[in-house]
Curated annotation (Swiss-Prot):
The large envelope protein is synthesized with the pre-S region at the cytosolic side of the endoplasmic reticulum and, hence will be within the virion after budding. Therefore the pre-S region is not N-glycosylated. Later a post-translational translocation of N-terminal pre-S and TM1 domains occur in about 50% of proteins at the virion surface. These molecules change their topology by an unknown mechanism, resulting in exposure of pre-S region at virion surface. Residues 2-253, 203-253, 370-375 are intravirion. This is Large envelope protein. It comes from Hepatitis B virus genotype A1 subtype adw2 (isolate Southern-Africa/Cai). A lipid is attached at residue 2 (N-myristoyl glycine).
Length: 400
């Protein structure tokens, strides 16, 4: 096997009836260790070499005309495998003579008592009595099986597979429902976080506006930096804790927070009163604005039971009531004033001032117009901190 030889080699390569499973190296011509069936071991002068361009030619294979390399395929070196076309006889071969004509009927199955005599004892009384023993029952029935009546049939394969699936994992959930279930809270959380960050800037903006009133025409500078605890130059709205002006900054922020809460409370009460959910019924006895008779402006009769009273009545009589035809907002304002006057008696001292202020309403309006004209360029900066509250007020107005 080790050397080159010009003499034809006898052995595995010379037996052309043995098929070459690979079909690429017929007769081991490309293997330099073999020179079988070669008059000249040199590949360039080997007349039996495999010409690869001829492999693209169409020849007759083992399964009819088709692509068959000239050196043969899985069937070896037969003439048909090498591409030689053989004439197939038109007459089919004769039928086999060792078969009977037609199909024979299926023989009748023997009775169960003959084919499976051991199965007949399952329905016997002795067998059922023996099953009462837990040790015997465990040999025939799995855990949780039933032994009443006849023996249980074979378990359902489909149900068994489904039970395995239920133990290994639940089926895939609807991704659309999962996405909508997660995106909704995430969007609400993002919107709430955005509104929260904007609302937290309201005290700082109002504090800046408040301190700017003390430094008209100049930049506000904290006065506490020249005290015994010197600090770097900073604004009075961002005092460090060691600055003496820090406590005044916290006091201003606290007053601003109370003002914002009062504003939200007033808006909520106005909204509830607008929807008739507050029993606001100001009583003005002896006033000429009252009218006795059928309540045309009331939505609920006097003797009716309503969860949200919206009728302002003084003396209900036979379905009639004394109605005060005033706007609900004025009724709400009077309700707040009466509520505050009871709890804060010093507010009664402001009544003459309020009456005088109302009497000077044209002057007041002119003053307001003048202030708006003066603060017009910076009006947006003053009102911009309250813009995040508008969506909250709108949601309360719609959903309450």
């Amino acid at each position: 096997m080790g050397g080159w030889s010009a003499k034809p080699r006898k052995g595995m390569g010379t037996n052309l009836s043995v098929p070459n499973p690979l079909g690429f190296f017929p007769d081991h011509q490309l293997d330099p260790a073999f020179g079988a069936n070669s008059n000249n071991p040199d590949w360039d002068f080997n007349p039996n070499k495999d010409h690869w361009p001829e492999a693209n030619q169409v020849g007759v294979g083992a399964f009819g005309p088709g692509f068959t390399p000239p050196h043969g395929g899985l069937l070896g070196w037969s003439s048909q495998a090498q591409g030689t076309l053989h004439t197939v006889p038109a007459v089919p071969p004769p039928a086999s003579t060792n078969r009977q004509t037609g199909r024979q009927p299926t023989p009748i199955s023997p009775p169960l008592r003959d084919s499976h005599p051991q199965a007949m004892q399952w329905n016997s009384t002795a067998f059922q009595q023996a099953l009462q023993d837990p040790r015997v029952r465990g040999l025939f029935f799995p855990a949780g099986g039933s032994s009443s009546g006849t023996v249980n049939p074979a378990p359902n394969i489909a149900s068994h597979i489904s039970s395995i699936s239920s133990r290994t994992g639940d089926p895939a959930l609807n991704m659309e429902n999962i996405t909508s279930g997660f995106l909704g809270p995430l969007l609400v959380l993002q919107a709430g976080f955005f509104l929260l960050t904007r609302i937290l800037t309201i005290p700082q903006s109002l504090d800046s506006w408040w301190t700017s009133l003390n430094f008209l025409g100049g930049s506000p500078v904290c006065l506490g930096q020249n005290s015994q605890s010197p600090t770097s130059n900073h604004s009075p709205t961002s005092c460090p804790p060691i600055c003496p002006g820090y406590r005044w900054m916290c006091l201003r922020r606290f007053i601003i927070f109370l003002f914002i809460l009062l504003l939200c409370l007033i808006f909520l009460l106005v909204l509830l009163d607008y929807q008739g959910m507050l029993p606001v019924c100001p009583l003005i006895p002896g006033s000429t604005t009252t009218s006795t008779g059928p309540c045309k402006t009331c939505t609920t009769p006097a003797q009716g039971n309503s969860m949200f009273p919206s009728c302002c009545c003084t003396k209900p009589t036979d379905g009639n009531c004394t109605c005060i035809p005033i706007p609900s907002s004025w009724a709400f304002a009077k309700y707040l004033w009466e509520w505050a006057s009871v709890r804060f008696s010093w507010l009664s001292l402001l009544v003459p001032f309020v009456q005088w202020f109302v009497g000077l309403s044209p002057t007041v309006w002119l003053s307001v117009i003048w202030m708006m004209w003066y603060w017009g360029p910076s009006l947006y900066n003053i009102l911009s901190p309250f813009i995040p509250l508008l969506p909250i007020f709108f949601c309360l107005w719609v959903y309450i």
